[in-house]
Regions:
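Outer membrane beta-barrel
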Residues: 3, 53-56, 78-190, 200-223, ...
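Short, structured coil/loop segments at alpha-helix boundaries
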Residues: 17-24, 38, 42, 98, ...
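Outer-membrane beta-barrel pore domains
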Residues: 2, 57, 64-82, 115-119, ...
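Alpha-helix capping and helix-loop boundary segments enriched in small/acidic/polar residues
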Residues: 197-198, 243
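Short amphipathic alpha-helical surface micro-motifs
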Residues: 31-38, 142, 300-304, 344-345
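N-terminal periplasmic/intermembrane-space "pro-region" immediately following the signal or transit peptide
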Residues: 1-55, 60-70, 75
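Low-complexity, polar-biased intrinsically disordered regions enriched in Pro/Ser/Thr/Gly
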Residues: 183-197, 282-287
């Protein structure tokens, strides 16, 4: 047989192979029912994965409130109760770019069940890539940034994160913090009117952290994070605009975590150095002196946890307890579901438990009792800014698919 004749046979086989591939794609479901795997289709299908979760939440909140009286004094009105009920739906999209890089996106919808107004919002909350450059892990885009186990920051950010190492990991990160957080409550009084609200500009950030295992079950972490230009801009007021406080803060943290069988004991110390470049009222006072006088610059968190519910394991459960005593200069967007009173300092505790009702259905319950640390120093002013004390009972059920 000549090479030309052999080429003709190969050409015919290739043509038939292309036809077979087209037929396999057309009848993929039927072939799958017959137990015939279509490898190429499976490989392509694995490139993109769509998952989701739906969380039903109810929170009952009870806190002491104070309000200004006509003679500009303050009085406690007693307990003011309210509740939050909502449904949060999330759709996750994970795609394989190549062997080293992946893409993750997340679309979120939240429906407010407190009224019949149809309040809801939908937004693209995550869009980032993960990959490797040499021996370095890279994450870039809009993702959930966690700093100091969430005791400093735990919410979305637009940024870049680099990490290197295995048993000892060194991490660097920088970017823009979300504006969807209460950096600090404010109160403006011009002698006639008083206006309160929240300053929400998260500013920019950069930081370094190192974490590793010191011994079996004993892990340590330490780091430094710098936040810049938080709360920039101005506040519209009846008699003009007032500059918002341009806040910078550098926060150190160091923590230990120890596994004891099914238990985990953790502790973390934090220290901040907050400063402001502008005034947030018309006085000529030095706001940095006020910061040093009234806003604590250090704090700590102690936690104890037992096991934990796993979505894939029906009947699994866990419990936890934490105590917080964090000054205003030690956090920006805290991970806790308790009331942290903006960025003004808080102390208190939280306890909770979680249980997997059925595969991919997890229930959570928690109780939080916190109070404002600023209230201890400025009982009149702090009362106008936010709750002085807060008790909340949190429940939710999350379905994943």
């Amino acid at each position: 047989m000549t090479r030309y004749e052999m080429a003709q046979i190969v050409a015919k086989a290739m043509a038939k192979g292309a036809s077979v591939e087209r037929l396999a794609a057309e009848f993929a479901d039927e072939l799958d029912n017959l137990g015939v795997r279509v490898a190429n289709l499976e490989k392509k299908a694995d490139n993109v994965k769509v998952t989701g979760e739906v969380r039903f939440r109810y929170v009952d909140q009870d806190g002491a409130m104070s309000r200004r009286t006509l003679d500009r004094g303050y009085r406690v009105l007693g307990n003011d109760s309210n509740h939050v009920a909502d449904i949060r739906s999330r759709i996750w999209i994970n795609g394989m770019i190549n062997d080293d890089w992946t893409y993750t996106g997340m679309l979120q919808n939240v429906q407010n069940l407190n009224n019949n107004a149809g309040d809801e919002n939908t937004s693209f909350q995550r869009a980032y890539v993960d990959g490797k450059l040499g021996g370095m892990a890279v994450r870039a885009g809009r993702y959930n940034l966690v700093i100091a186990d969430g005791n400093i920051y735990d919410t979305r950010a637009d940024g870049l994160e680099l990490s290197y190492g295995n048993k000892v990991k060194v991490k660097g990160f920088a970017g823009k913090a979300t504006d969807d957080i209460t950096v600090v409550p404010f109160m403006i009084n011009d002698g006639i009117n008083t206006e309160t609200g929240d300053i929400t500009n998260g500013g920019k950030y950069w930081g370094l952290a190192v974490e590793g295992e010191l011994a079996k079950g004993l892990k340590a972490t330490a780091g430094y994070t710098q936040f810049k230009d938080m709360g920039t801009g101005s506040v519209a007021f009846d008699n003009g605009n007032f500059d918002k406080t341009d806040i910078d803060n550098g926060i150190w943290h160091a923590g230990l975590s120890y596994d004891m069988g099914h238990f985990n004991l953790s502790a973390m110390y934090l220290k901040g150095d907050l400063s402001a470049d502008k005034l947030n009222d018309r006085s000529d006072g030095n706001i940095n002196k006020a910061i040093d006088k009234y806003l604590d610059d250090d704090g700590f968190v102690i936690g104890l946890a037992y096991k934990g519910a796993k979505a894939e394991d029906a009947g699994s459960w866990g419990a936890w307890a934490k105590y917080y005593d964090q000054g205003a200069q030690t956090y920006v967007a805290h991970t806790t579901d308790a009331n942290t009173f903006g960025m003004t300092g808080f102390k208190g505790f939280g306890v909770g438990a979680n249980y997997t009702l059925a595969k991919n259905i997890v229930a959570n319950v928690a109780y939080y009792n916190t109070e404002s640390k600023l209230m201890k120093e400025l009982p009149g002013i702090a009362a106008d800014l936010d709750r002085t004390k807060d008790h909340r009972f949190w429940t939710d059920v999350t379905f994943t698919f």
